[in-house]
UniProtKB/Swiss-Prot annotation:
Miscellaneous note of the record: In the transfer reaction, the free carboxyl group of lipoic acid is attached via an amide linkage to the epsilon-amino group of a specific lysine residue of lipoyl domains of lipoate-dependent enzymes.
An individual GO BP term: protein modification process
Annotated positions binding ATP: R71, G76, A77, V78, F79, K134
Family matches, as InterPro entries: aa-tRNA-synth_II/BPL/LPL, BPL_LPL_catalytic, Lipoate_ligase_A, Lipoate_protein_ligase_C, LipoylTrfase_LipoateP_Ligase
Pfam families xref list: Lip_prot_lig_C, LplA-B_cat
Gene this chain is encoded by: lplA
Family as reported in the entry's similarity comment: Belongs to the LplA family.
Lineage of producing organism: Bacteria, Pseudomonadati, Pseudomonadota, Gammaproteobacteria, Enterobacterales
Natural source organism: Escherichia coli O9:H4 (strain HS)
Molecular-function annotations in GO: ATP binding; lipoate-protein ligase activity; lipoyltransferase activity
Transmembrane segments: none
Keyword Cell membrane: no
Record-listed E.C. numbers: 6.3.1.20
Identification of the protein by name: Lipoate-protein ligase A
A GO CC annotation given for this chain: cytosol
Pathway where it operates: Protein modification; protein lipoylation via exogenous pathway; protein N(6)-(lipoyl)lysine from lipoate: step 1/2; Protein modification; protein lipoylation via exogenous pathway; protein N(6)-(lipoyl)lysine from lipoate: step 2/2
Length: 338
């Protein structure tokens, strides 16, 4: 019986694909070597310990229907669209070795006619007249008895959109998380015009088989039916939840300020695990009472636009004469924290 397993996803849903990856990783036998090939529609994927409000322009993402997905590995934020091919290599220990999976990807690129090399901790680069350009980035995860290496190859990604979503708003955002280094990147279509996702998947598959001297039939994972994987439904529910994607952010502070016709407002939030642990409001409004009441209501509130808006509007009962001000405040806050 083959020790290899090849899975190819037909889904473009990042939460679905990451849930598939997680389920396979948890239940695979330690003797198995797995290759999973997939891609995501418009998504920002962040590392396990990253702060989405720091790393991403979450407001623009919401406007453009770009999803946020937190992966279980470390590393930085990346933008995925259908111009990316994603790969995951998994193996039990002691056999797991990320240099093997890296060499498989390099061999696949070489077979396609691209000479690339490993650079730094987790990048693959090609040499161009303008200098080295990144075509692949990776991240890794290890447990006591297994490990995985996953990454992306830039085929024909919209690099201008990459900058749109990975450059955060210029907010006064003092985070305890770390901002990722942005790398200079290029698409493989610049070197191989017309290269497709299917061709890249085939090349990686051939290099995978060649390395291990075995072949195996591909298992197609379809979004049309629930994958036959242990605990998939629970894993997908967690992967797609606000609590996982946003609520796992490291502690941070956020300062919002705005001037309205009725006065200036400064809001100071301390946020931990997606909840406001401290809220302070400063204002030169002639009627500060509703704002002072708001600070009390926001303590413990989820740091989510709809929840903050709800707390603002709840004050209308106690402060009906300030309806105009409270509605303006509510609209501004909801937009500012997206």
């Amino acid at each position: 019986m083959s020790t290899l397993r090849l899975l190819i996803s037909d889904s473009y849903d990042p939460w679905f694909n990451l849930a598939v990856e997680e389920c396979i990783f948890r239940q695979m036998p330690a003797t198995q070597r797995v290759l999973f090939l997939w891609r995501n529609a418009d998504t920002v994927v962040i590392g396990r310990a990253q702060n989405p409000w720091k790393e991403c322009n979450t407001r623009r993402m919401e406007e453009d229907n770009v999803r946020l997905a937190r992966r279980s590995s470390g590393g930085g934020a990346v933008f995925h669209d259908l111009g990316n091919t994603c790969f995951t290599f998994m193996a039990g220990k002691p056999e797991y070795d990320k240099t093997i999976s890296t060499s498989i990807v390099l061999n696949a690129l070489n077979a396609l006619g691209v000479s690339a090399e490993a650079s730094g901790r987790n990048d693959l680069v090609v040499k161009t007249a303008e200098g080295d350009r990144k075509v692949s980035g990776s991240a890794y995860r290890e447990t006591k008895d297994r490990g995985f290496h996953h990454g992306t190859l830039l085929l024909n990604a919209d690099l201008s959109r990459l900058a749109n979503y990975l450059n955060p708003d210029k907010k006064k955002l003092a985070a305890k998380g770390i901002t990722s280094v942005r790398s200079r990147v290029t698409n493989l279509t610049e070197l191989l015009p017309g290269i497709t996702h299917e061709q890249v998947c085939e090349a990686i598959t051939k290099a995978f088989f060649a390395h291990y001297g075995e072949r195996v039939e591909a298992e197609i994972i379809s979004p049309d039916k629930t994958p036959d994987l242990p605990n998939f439904a629970e894993t997908f529910a967690r992967q797609s939840s606000w609590e996982w994607n946003f609520g796992q952010a490291p502690a941070f502070s956020h300062l919002l300020d705005e001037r309205f016709s009725w006065g200036g407002v400064e809001l100071h939030f301390d946020v931990e695990k997606g909840h406001i642990t401290r809220a302070q409001v400063f204002t030169d409004s002639l009627n500060p009472a509703p704002l002072e009441a708001l600070a009390g209501r926001l303590q413990g509130c989820l740091y989510r636009a709809d929840m903050l808006q709800q707390e603002c509007e709840a004050l209308l009962v106690d402060f009906p004469d300030q309806e105009k001000e409270l509605r303006e405040l509510s609209t501004w806050i909801a937009g500012a924290v997206r």
